[in-house]
Amino acid sequence: MSLQGFQQALTDLVMSPALRARVAEDPSACLAGYDLSDLERRRLEALARDPRVRTPTLLHRSFRLSMIANTLPRSCKALGPRGLRELTHAYWGEGPPRTMQFVKEALRFGGYALGRLRDGSFQHDFLEELLETEMAALTLDRSGAAWEAGERAVPDDLAFRTPRLHPACRVIPWRHDPDAVLAALDAGRPLEGFEEGEHCLLLAAAGAGKLITKTFGTAERRALLAADGTRTVGDLCAELDLPGRVFAELVAAGWLV
């Protein structure tokens, strides 16, 4: 007899209606992976058929949903009840939670949702950019890095420097105007009528939990996304067909280092 095996099986049954259905249909096969006594196995078989187990399942799912809704609020709002239900139920069906920490669970769910968007199994025009933005904000908040405002000196040999994004910053490419989309979402307006283009949203951790956001147009977007610390400004200007002043302004502002 293994109390740990019984507790694990019971936890899995409470968390997964799909597992309960499988256990009710074929208990021997579904419970074979747990270290159980005959008595424990019979108890679990009975529980799998007991409709009252739905109540703790609902409580568990409410808690898991709160972990996502409190950390990825705009993504959840954009999804709406139907889309959120579809994604979360599919995500929960992948297996039990691996953590009870809100941020870790949000990042894990976000990674799952991004995977669904990129393989085409889930469709949403705005979710990818919203998820990437909120996930970047969560990551920055935990990083301990801080960006400080102020004018920086631009080196005379900038053309030979290999710039990269400030470590306390993240840049998220957007296909729509971030300011317009976020304003509409926060005001409860439908996400409709937005033209596609080359936009980006820069996030900067400023310390003490403060997050600075700034939107950029096409030229700055290309420069910020391409500056990975491996190519010189001269090479980037030639490759992207950009004037050197774009990089000079980003360095002066401290977005690139």
Which residue ranges define each predicted feature?
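Low-complexity, glycine/alanine/valine/leucine- and proline-rich hydrophobic stretches
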Residues: 161-229
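Long, charge-rich, low-complexity alpha-helical segments
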Residues: 1-156, 206-257
